[in-house]
Amino acid sequence: MSEHTAVLRRFNRTYTQRIGVLDESFLGTGFPLGVSRLLFEIGPSGATVRDLRERLDLDSGYLTRLLRRLGDDGLVDVRPDPDDRRRRLVSLTARGRTAWRRLDDRSEDLARSIVDPLTERKRDRLTEALQTADLLVRAATIHLRTVEPTDPAGVEAVGHYFAELDRRFPTGFDAGEGAHDAESMASGAGAFVVATSDGRPVACGGVQQVRPGVGEVKRMWVHPEWRGAGLGSRMLRHLEAEAARLGHRRVVLDTNATLVEAISMYERAGYSPTERYNENPYAQAWFEKVLKGPGSRRSTSRA
C-alpha cells in the first residue's frame, strides 16, 4: 500500500463514518444514503432519468428500483416527456419537496458541525484543500468515452473549443477551416473522445489519419475550470492509445504559439518539434511523438 492510497483510504473511512454513510436512515430521513442522494439530485427543478443515470453513474435497473421506492412513498412523479416521449421526466411531489428541504437543511447542519469548531484561517485551509481534492478526484475518475463527432456532447465541446480559439487568437478563428475534420474523426476512420460532468462536456479530443501509420491529435480542449488537474494529460494519453489502436506508430499535432499551456503539456508528454506537415493557417508549431505499446512499433521517419 502506498502512502497516497493509505491517506485516501483513511480519509474515506473517517469522513463516511462522520457523515453517517453507514446509517440505515441517512440524516434521519428514513432512507439510506443512496436513496437520499437521488432525492437531492432530482431537486426542485426535476431531471430526466437519463440525466440522473449519467450524473450519478448508476445502473439503469438500480436507478429504476430507487425511483420506484421514492414513488411508492409519494415523493416523486415519473412521466413521459411531452416533447419527446422516449424520455422520462422525474419531478418532486409536494411531499417530495418537503423531504428535499428537510434533507438540504440537515446536510447544511452536518457541514456546519464540521467547520464551526475550526478557526477562520483553518476553515479557509479546509475549503481550499477540499476544492483541490474535489477537482483532482473528478479529473482522475471522469469517464472518457468514444463517440461520433456528431454526438451532442461532442458538438457542444467543439463549439466551446472554437469559441476559445476565436477569443485567444490575435486574428480570431474561422470554424469553417476545420469543418472537414469531423468526418475524418468518425468511427472507422479515426476516433473522437469526450468527457462529461453533470451532463456537460468538460473535455474533448480526436484522432485522424495523416497517412498510414501516422495519426494526428485534433481538437484537444479542456474546460477552463478543469485545467491544472491533469485531465488534459489524461485525455492526451487516451488519444495516443486510440491512435495505437487504429494502427498508427506515430502521432503528430499542431498548435498556435498563443496556447502556451498546451505546448508545455505536449513537451512534458514527450512530444518533439517537427517540420510543418499541413496547411493549417493557424498553426505555428508542429510536434510529433513515437508511440510505444500494443499496435505500434518504433519508427524514426518524420512527418
How should these model regions be labeled?
Residues V21, A139, T146-K218, H223, ...:
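Acetyl-CoA-dependent GNAT
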Residues T146-T150, R249-A269, E275-A303:
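C-terminal "cap" of GNAT-fold acetyltransferases
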Residues V21-Y62, L67, D73-L75, A182-A195, ...:
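N-terminal helix-turn-helix DNA-binding core of bacterial DNA-binding proteins
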Residues D105-R145, P149, F287-K289:
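Terminal interaction helix/tail motif
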Residues R50-D51, V214, L236, E242-N256:
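Conserved GNAT acetyl-CoA-binding A-motif
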Residues G46-R88, R97, G199-R200, C204-G206, ...:
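Canonical helix-turn-helix DNA-binding module
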Residues V222, G228-A241, S264-R268:
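Conserved acetyl-CoA-binding loop-helix of GNAT-fold acetyltransferases
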